Amino acid sequence: MGKAENYEMYSVELGPGPGGDMAAKMSKKKAGKGGGKKKEKLENMKKEMEINDHQLSVAELEQKYQTSATKGLSASLAADLLLRDGPNALRPPRGTPEYVKFARQLAGGLQCLMWVAAAICLIAFAIQASEGDLTTDDNLYLALALIAVVVVTGCFGYYQEFKSTNIIASFKNLVPQQATVIRDGDKFQINADQLVVGDLVEMKGGDRVPADIRILQAQGCKVDNSSLTGESEPQTRSPECTHESPLETRNIALFSTMCLEGTAQGLVVNTGDRTIIGRIASLASGVENEKTPIAIEIEHFVDIIAGLAILFGATFFVVAMCIGYTFLRAMVFFMAIVVAYVPEGLLATVTVCLSLTAKRLASKNCVVKNLEAVETLGSKSVICSDKTGTLTQNSMTVSNLWFDNHIHTADTTEDQSGQKFDQSSETWRALCRVLTLCNRAAFKSGQDAVPVPKRIVIGDASETALLKFSELTLGNAMGYRERFPKVCEIPFNSTNKFQLSIHTLEDPRDPRHVLVMKGAPERVLERCSSILIKGQELPLDEQWREAFQTAYLSLGGLGERVLGFCQLYLSEKDYPPGYAFDVEAMNFPTSGLCFAGLVSMIDPPRATVPDAVLKCRTAGIRVIMVTGDHPITAKAIAASVGIISEGSETVEDIAARLRVPVDQVNRKDARACVINGMQLKDMDPSELVEALRTHPEMVFARTSPQQKLVIVESCQRLGAIVAVTGDGVNDSPALKKADIGVAMGIAGSDAAKNAADMILLDDNFASIVTGVEQGRLIFDNLKKSIAYTLTKNIPELTPYLIYITVSVPLPLGCITILFIELCTDIFPSVSLAYEKAESDIMHLRPRNPKRDRLVNEPLAAYSYFQIGAIQSFAGFTDYFTAMAQEGWFPLLCVGLRPYWENHHLQDLQDSYGQEWTFGQRLYQQYTCYTVFFISIEMCQIADVLIRKTRRLSAFQQGFFRNRILVIAIVFQVCIGCFLCYCPGMPNIFNFMPIRYQWWLVPMPFGLLIFVYDEIRKLGVRCCPGSWWDQELYY
């Protein structure tokens, strides 16, 4: 994470372990919850690795690995080591069989509830069949329908999971196939997985590093660690040990990184899973996926539903036994009540709502791999964001210039309209010439029509930035170079820390040469004796050195990478045309040069990021930067994008302002805090948690993959729902551990993408804010959909309760309930997913996962016992009306059930003395089913209208803003008409044609529901915080 020339990953302890093994000491980290070998192994992997191979002399390395730095290992020893250590490959964890993955999709919270309901239906069917009381196959049909719903939604979920691949497979793609090895003094090619520790290997530009290598010889070798760290800045590799950390030092090349240029020879010090990338692979695959908040909410909801279903069922089982029913009959009643209480359509509703939101997010460059992650986006309270490519553009850009004793802001736009300095200045012309000529980068051919910022450049990041800036200011940088032919060049190296080239001048009448140099500012300045000011060479005295130092510190303090530039005209007398410049003999001057100026570069923030961070702050979401970059650069970028807000100070800032030592400052006075990897390594978990609690604005720099994982766990320990962004292989463990992992689609490695739950196709942090908004909206709308879905459970349940306790003919059948749950009500409940937000949801704080539940007590009470009760009254009113108009008055219906269901009784008399056969009574019962069905549907139209809002009036929200909902209501009514009046329905699905006036009976109840809810919302709006608000706002 983050762009940096150096990158710290693990700590170092002096002293090799016995037997050639790496030191086993680990920095102490707090163990996570739970026990077991797997958990202990994961905790050990989180700890920092300690090796010292980079600090040993060549002789000590030869002794440690029983090898030769010139001839390599013997073939026999190599064979023994391969047998002992195994192949140089990443060992994948035991894969999960596909059938197990599919089975998991069938065993979620709601799925289990529906499996139980299906089993109960089958048991009830079997009991009825055994008693010879099987007048209908409704229970069998209901069981089959429930199983079908679970299987179909399970297939959908499995398809979503199937699209993502195993994390370890992406690491395999990083492993090189071949390696050049020297054994017994002979050089040959072998498969990379046959390498062992102690092998002497060679690599060149274009090769992947075949293992963790200690460099013994190198010529201009540079490696690209982007596959490991996500960074694009090339890293120089040489035999010298330059730092105590193996990742800071230049004499270690890491497994799977790319050798960009030059050649190198070295000894293998780690292979396979013992390499750095091997440890990261093991760490990522060992991290278990956390339950998403929505999964936790659904489990909580299932617990409520199951508890209430069993409570109601047990209550009426006891009542049935007391009334005099047989045990088996009472058990059938118990099962019927439990099944009636299960919201069969809810699983499909939740799945479809999440899928619709995922589709909306995909249109906004956010691809969601896990449907449950959609809601998690809205729940998150902390974002641990990578810097490079996420907050920044992942492209080094010239930002500031210092010449003529002034710092100028560079304009990198196409039209150069913002360039404020005088481009006719002789000093500027000289500086521009140096940065153009002393540059090895080149544009890829055939890009003349491509805008300069988007052109592909062959070269490293810094030289690319300089070339593009030169192209924008001069107009044709490549053509400009051709006018100054290069006759000699010394490439940049870690020893000299400068790059030098000598050119002939463009004027054929001027036979002189010009020497141009760029490099580390202090190294360039020490080779200069004069400075160019307003086109004149002035002596580089103490005054100008102080001016240089002030400018250098000012630019460096901005977290920018600074380069110095100088030049020297070589006299014609000493260096005539055709002079043989020799870079080995250095037969030309490299001192007494003329300093031209400084140029600073930075990977600039994306233009949309500051606004996105501000929106996060407004929404109560904390943004933490976690990067591998230098602390100064990290702090500068954090301040520029708003992660560290204006006026916020770190402990160091306060100490500098008060001019006191840092240890005299109260850390709690600092709102912001920047912690580097070395400091983090020395902190125990409680100290890290305290730092996160104390400082609202946090930046972590120079962090390792293990440390990123620890940071995520610490945030979760504070009760936060954590999102992590990343693009490198090193990010994959934290991405998997987070509540939601967000990978970059353009710059992201395959490992990061596979570990993540969501992929940003445009690599833009602002897209995450879009995801937050959609996630919050879907949580609100899921609440509305669930409230709508649950309401009809009561009018579906009460017919069975009255049927058992009062013994009336059954008002509503199982098949009719299925049509309500899985047909007519699905469309309105899904249409609520399209509802617009009632207010600016991005001005609300993230929901508290322990307090703000998807299904809370007010929602259940209001849906079940208020709106649901009104719907039940509507259904029974229509039911008794239909029975009375056919001759069965309400009082006669009480206790009628045993006679009504007796298929041997063919002359049962109604209130008018008319005799009814069993077949006629059965058709009348189907008519009652249909009437009750229509009553529920008419009331549900009012219910879906009131569910459009939870606080605002429906008039404020607008009835027709959600066109999908209007279409769903029309479709619902059409289905109801079709089921009632389509020929053949009585024999197929037990629906009968009904009188038109029976459609009108429930309408007053629907109006009552609407008015009742408007009164509730008015009270909620007028009395915030009151008893009314607490009990009736869901």
UniProtKB/Swiss-Prot annotation:
The active site is at 386 (4-aspartylphosphate intermediate). K(+) binds at residues 339-340, 342, 344, 796, 821. One of its GO terms (biological process) is sodium ion export across plasma membrane. PROSITE patterns: ATPASE_E1_E2 (PS00154). Residues 1-97, 163-298, 349-782, 834-853, 949-962, 1018-1034 are cytoplasmic. InterPro entries: ATPase_P-typ_cation-transptr_C, ATPase_P-typ_cation-transptr_N, ATPase_P-typ_cyto_dom_N, ATPase_P-typ_H/K-transp_N, ATPase_P-typ_P_site, ATPase_P-typ_TM_dom_sf, ATPase_P-typ_transduc_dom_A_sf, Cation_transp_ATPase_P-type. The chain crosses the membrane at residues 98-118, 142-162, 299-318, 331-348, 783-802, 813-833, 854-876, 929-948, 963-981, 997-1017. The keyword Transmembrane helix applies. It catalyses: K(+)(out) + ATP + H2O + H(+)(in) = K(+)(in) + ADP + phosphate + 2 H(+)(out). It is an enzyme of class 7 (translocase). SUPFAM superfamilies: Calcium ATPase, transduction domain A, Calcium ATPase, transmembrane domain M, HAD-like, Metal cation-transporting ATPase, ATP-binding domain N. One of its GO terms (molecular function) is ATP binding. Gene3D superfamilies: Calcium-transporting ATPase, cytoplasmic domain N, Calcium-transporting ATPase, cytoplasmic transduction domain A, Calcium-transporting ATPase, transmembrane domain, HAD superfamily/HAD-like. Residues 14-41, 225-245 are annotated as: Disordered. Residues 225-239 have a biased composition (Polar residues). It is found in: Apical cell membrane. The modification Phosphotyrosine is found at residues 7, 10. The gastric H(+)/K(+) ATPase pump is composed of the catalytic alpha subunit ATP4A and the regulatory beta subunit ATP4B. Interacts (via the P-domain) with ATP4B (via N-terminus); this interaction stabilizes the lumenal-open E2 conformation state and prevents the reverse reaction of the transport cycle. This is Potassium-transporting ATPase alpha chain 1. It comes from Canis lupus familiaris (Dog).
